């Protein structure tokens, strides 16, 4: 048992730590881009993991995006991801997780029981889906988005590695 980790989070303990890697993004309203990403999952002894994420451009190192929030286990096999973006978007994604050997998979969405909140100046985002796969020291994910009048489609994908 990971020290002081709430029992409900034990199955997700391999997420804990710092991750870094590279990803790519695309959307019909923007040019394709590549980014460097850093993610940290931590805990404070309560029944949730803290989550911080930041990206920067591969080409010039300029900051691109960041998110902060919490990953909560609502019951075994069920998770909620609660995030805030500095662009004026908040999201609650609800989904499932499964553990098979050393592999953890999470499927999350705002479309069923989740929600998106928009500040008055935020771009219109109406749906987000995320898929995560953790296999040992590798974390990969994809994100689909429905926004600014476009249908739900692939937006981001990245592969990160555990930092020692």
UniProtKB/Swiss-Prot annotation:
Enzyme Commission number(s) from the entry: 5.99.-.-
Cite a single Pfam family from the UniProt record. THAP4_heme-bd
Q: Does the keyword Transcription regulation apply?
A: no
What the record notes about the co-factor is:
Binds 1 heme b group per subunit, that coordinates a highly solvent-exposed Fe(III) atom.
Q: Calcium among the record's keywords?
A: no
What task does this protein carry out? Heme-binding protein able to scavenge peroxynitrite and to protect free L-tyrosine against peroxynitrite-mediated nitration, by acting as a peroxynitrite isomerase that converts peroxynitrite to nitrate. Therefore, this protein likely plays a role in peroxynitrite sensing and in the detoxification of reactive nitrogen and oxygen species (RNS and ROS, respectively). In M.tuberculosis, could be part of the pool of proteins required to scavenge RNS and ROS produced by the host during the immunity response.
SUBUNIT field: Homodimer.
PANTHER family on file = PEROXYNITRITE ISOMERASE THAP4, THAP4 PROTEIN
User: In the UniProt entry, what is the domain comment?
Assistant: Forms a 10-stranded antiparallel beta-barrel structure able to accommodate a hydrophobic ligand in its interior. In fact, this fold hosts the heme group, which is located in a wide surface cleft.
What's the protein here called?
Peroxynitrite isomerase 1
């Amino acid at each position: 048992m990971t020290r002081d980790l709430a029992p409900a989070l034990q199955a997700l303990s391999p997420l804990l730590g710092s991750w870094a890697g590279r990803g790519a993004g695309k959307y019909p309203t923007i040019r394709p881009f590549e980014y460097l990403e850093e993610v940290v999952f931590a805990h404070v002894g309560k029944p949730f993991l803290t989550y911080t994420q930041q990206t920067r451009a591969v080409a010039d190192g300029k900051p691109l995006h960041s998110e902060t929030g919490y990953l909560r286990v609502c019951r075994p096999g069920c998770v909620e991801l609660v995030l805030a973006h500095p662009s004026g978007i908040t999201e609650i994604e609800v989904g499932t997780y499964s553990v098979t050997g050393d592999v953890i998979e999470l499927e999350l969405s705002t479309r069923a029981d989740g929600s998106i909140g928009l500040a008055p100046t935020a771009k219109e985002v109406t749906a987000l889906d995320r898929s995560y796969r953790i296999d040992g020291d590798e974390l990969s994910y994809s994100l689909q988005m429905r926004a600014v009048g476009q249908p739900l489609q692939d937006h981001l994908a990245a592969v990160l590695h555990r930092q020692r």
